[in-house]
């Protein structure tokens, strides 16, 4: 039986030792590349954070460009980064069209004559009311408010506004209505309280203003977004270098043993 040369044994041992080292090093290198690939989309997603598209347009999710809205179909009325424009409002059957929808303004609708809509009925137009018996109308019905009525005093009552003074025609022999009271304050009589004015004197703490987050020198700034990028000299790269050095040492030992 032929004897296996020492050189062949030496080559087999070297291959058996270096293959696991190279395989492990390749796996470590692939793991180092993964964080770099995940950071790229995150940076692209925040690249338009400080920019906004003008009114009448929106931000495209695919290209990041500002796409214009369609006249009469959708709109945006302020700077934005919306993925799409807002659809124009369509006036209901109980409303009339006041102004059309543009790229920067929605449709304006209002209730038809004889109807109104206010805070109590924002979803629909209601029919204007009529003053009940014993009351007179002081304001007309509009598209945004119902009529206003007040009680009627006497047959010849004259009403100017809801808060107006009442004028009554008196016939001879009828006691005249009491005259308006005039509040004249004599010395020593406390005057009616005037409107309260908030005036701060020196030493009085002023009302708290809006809180402004300002960092002074030496104050840690808010944490920024983490970017996982490994540079040469990080633990992963050092590990790869250590594996290579170990393989070289093993190779030298084998040379000393078999040669």
UniProtKB/Swiss-Prot annotation:
Membrane topology listed for this record? Lipid-anchor; GPI-anchor
Which residue ranges contain the repeat TNFR-Cys?
A: 29-66, 69-109, 110-149
Spell out where lipidation (GPI-anchor amidated alanine) occurs: 236
Tissue specificity here reads: Higher expression in normal tissues than in tumor cell lines. Highly expressed in peripheral blood lymphocytes, spleen, skeletal muscle, placenta, lung and heart.
SUPFAM superfamilies hit by this protein = TNF receptor-like
The source's domain of life comes to: Eukaryota
The chain's disulfide connectivity reads 53-66, 69-85, 88-101, 91-109, 111-125, 128-141, 131-149
Q: Where are the TAPE repeats?
A: 162-176, 177-191, 192-206, 207-221, 222-236
Concerning Pfam families, the annotation shows: TNFR_c6
In its UniProt record, which GO terms are filed under biological process? positive regulation of apoptotic process; TRAIL-activated apoptotic signaling pathway
Q: Post-translational modification, briefly? A: N-glycosylated and O-glycosylated.
Give a Gene Ontology cellular component term annotated to this protein: side of membrane
| Signal peptide region | 1-25
What is this protein's record name?
Tumor necrosis factor receptor superfamily member 10C
Species of provenance: Homo sapiens
Q: What is the lineage of its organism?
A: Eukaryota, Metazoa, Chordata, Craniata, Vertebrata
């Amino acid at each position: 039986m032929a004897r296996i040369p020492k050189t062949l044994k030496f080559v087999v041992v070297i291959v058996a030792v270096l293959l696991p080292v190279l395989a492990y090093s390749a796996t470590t290198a692939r793991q180092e590349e993964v964080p770099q690939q995940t950071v790229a989309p995150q940076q692209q997603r925040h690249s338009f954070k400080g920019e906004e598209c003008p009114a009448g347009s929106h931000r495209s999710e695919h290209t990041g460009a500002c796409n214009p809205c369609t006249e009469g179909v959708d709109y945006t009325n302020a700077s934005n980064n919306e993925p799409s424009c807002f659809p124009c409002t369509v006036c209901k059957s109980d409303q009339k069209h006041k102004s059309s929808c543009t790229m920067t303004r929605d449709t304006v609708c209002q209730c038809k004559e004889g109807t109104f809509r206010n805070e109590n009925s924002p979803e629909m137009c209601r029919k204007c009311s009529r003053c009940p018996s014993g009351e007179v109308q002081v304001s007309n019905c509009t598209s945004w408010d119902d009529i206003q009525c007040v009680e009627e005093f006497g047959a010849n009552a004259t009403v100017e506004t809801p808060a107006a003074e009442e004028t009554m025609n008196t016939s001879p022999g009828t006691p005249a209505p009491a005259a308006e009271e005039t509040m004249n304050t004599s010395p020593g009589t406390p005057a009616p309280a005037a409107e309260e004015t908030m005036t701060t004197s020196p030493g009085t703490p002023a009302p708290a203003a809006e809180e402004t987050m300002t960092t002074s020198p030496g104050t840690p700034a808010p944490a920024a977004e983490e970017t996982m990028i490994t540079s040469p000299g990080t633990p992963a790269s050092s590990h790869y270098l250590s594996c290579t050095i170990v393989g070289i040492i093993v190779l030298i030992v084998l040379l000393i043993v078999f040669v």
